[in-house]
Amino acid sequence: MTILRKITAVIVSILLPFFLLMTAIRLVFQPVFLQVEYNAPGFPEDPYGFTVEDRLKWGGISLDYLFNNAGISFLADQRLPDGAPLYNERELGHMLDVKNLVQLMLKVWLGLFVMLALGLIWAWRGDWVPEFGRAYARGGWLTLGIIGAILIAIVVSFDWLFTAFHRI
């Protein structure tokens, strides 16, 4: 294996966990996920009195906002049946931050997909698919290691992890 192939294999192994994580996040940000979650047995009642139908409606609108090109007015203009705004100013600021992070993640996710696909094409055309496959396998093991580390961090100090995540 040439040095360039070895470097590519290492890069693939490192990039794969990020691609898989972003793929999982993208799958969660789907209307069907809201349907499954809000209709799950034992899902807690809403403290503000929203019904499951209300939650699905407003959750769907909020998901739409994260993936469309609209400004914050898309959410700021949403009104509850009594005329009150759906989001207060603090929540709107948070949703804008989430949208910016999601939009950045989508761009990075697409870039990772292109890089991994180009690597696979190069490996296929260069007849080194087995080595490339081993790089994917190492990336898979690295992904499991990262998931394990995150789970340990959650068990040891959820509050710290939650705060650190929301500083991103």
Q: Over which residues does each language-model region extend?
A:
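Hydrophobic secretory-pathway targeting helix
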Residues: M1-L34
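Peri-membrane helix termini and adjoining interfacial loops of integral membrane proteins
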Residues: P85-L86, I121, R167-I168
